[in-house]
């Protein structure tokens, strides 16, 4: 187990922020994301929706820092975990290794605390300060409970619990559930999920919903699942096409999203009718002018 460096990033908890400012991403000459602004805090529950190919996963990767936007800035204070929709097939790790890597920081914090306690008992100079710092790190990470959190999630998601099983021997769904359980146990400041319900049964979805609603950290989820949208999302980012090519951000949960979409469509229909009326008026004026030219009046 590696020792925890005092420079290792720690969760920011209530101070955590993830801010995307004027973010744009191009695919060739085609804009995928167009000047997106989004602020996520430790209490945010955000869902990203839209048709296939509209940039939902792209936005998730931009927020995670794994994709650099063509323009705009993403700033983050705090730790982050992401579960992608696609899972690698050649992963030779065991379930136990995946769990250990996911909670490496809490495990290292406990090892550092044990070492600091031994130094304190031996009367080593400066041991009190090192012990106090190690204890603070362990408390911030809730390190004593990390392994239990993962085990609870593995069982609740019906994931593989045998630590000796190789990930490449598991199905795609099983690998995803192991990854998801590890992330839930790691307890990062921000949890980013791409279509998590694809590999969950009803009981797994209920467990995930409870976890996302109660966790002490921000959530961003790409999903088409209406139950998850209704039960978890408080803010919904809609990447579907709009007249001005701008993403729409709706508050007040799924109900607010549906009402916002309805109002947006009514505005669009009203504007379309106004334009058609104006077009008809211009055509009538043009016809009248042409008739006067022909008749000489």
Sequence positions of predicted segments:
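Intracellular alpha-helical coupling/juxtamembrane segments of multi-pass membrane proteins
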Residues: 261-289, 293
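ABC ATP-binding cassette signature C-motif
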Residues: 1-270
């Amino acid at each position: 187990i590696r020792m925890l460096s005092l420079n290792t990033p720690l969760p920011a908890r209530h101070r955590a922020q993830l801010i995307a400012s004027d973010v744009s991403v191009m695919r060739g000459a085609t804009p995928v994301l167009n000047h997106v602004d989004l602020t996520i805090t430790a209490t945010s529950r955000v869902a990203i929706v839209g048709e296939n190919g509209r940039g939902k996963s792209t936005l998730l990767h931009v927020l995670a820092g794994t994709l650099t936007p063509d323009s705009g800035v993403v700033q983050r204070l705090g730790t982050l975990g992401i579960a992608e929709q696609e899972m690698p097939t050649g992963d030779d790790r065991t379930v136990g290794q995946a769990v250990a890597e996911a909670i490496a920081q809490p495990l290292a914090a406990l090892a550092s605390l044990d070492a600091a306690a031994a130094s304190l008992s031996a009367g080593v100079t400066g041991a009190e300060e090192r012990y106090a710092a190690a204890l603070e790190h362990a408390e911030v990470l809730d390190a004593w409970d990390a392994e239990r959190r993962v085990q609870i999630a593995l069982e609740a998601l019906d994931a593989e619990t045998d630590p000796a099983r190789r990930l490449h021997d598991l199905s795609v769904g099983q690998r995803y559930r192991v990854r998801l359980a590890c992330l839930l146990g790691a307890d990062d400041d921000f949890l980013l999920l791409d279509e998590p319900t694809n590999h969950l049964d009803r009981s797994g979805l209920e467990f995930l919903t409870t976890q996302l609603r109660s966790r002490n950290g921000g959530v961003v989820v790409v999903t088409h699942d209406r139950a998850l949208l209704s039960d978890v999302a408080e803010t919904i980012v809609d990447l579907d096409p709009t007249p001005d090519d701008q993403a729409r951000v709706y508050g007040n949960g799924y109900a607010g999203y549906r009402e916002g979409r309805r109002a947006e469509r009514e505005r669009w229909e009203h504007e379309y009718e106004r334009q058609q009326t104006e077009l008809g008026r211009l055509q009538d004026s043009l016809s009248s002018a042409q008739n006067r030219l022909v008749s000489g009046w």
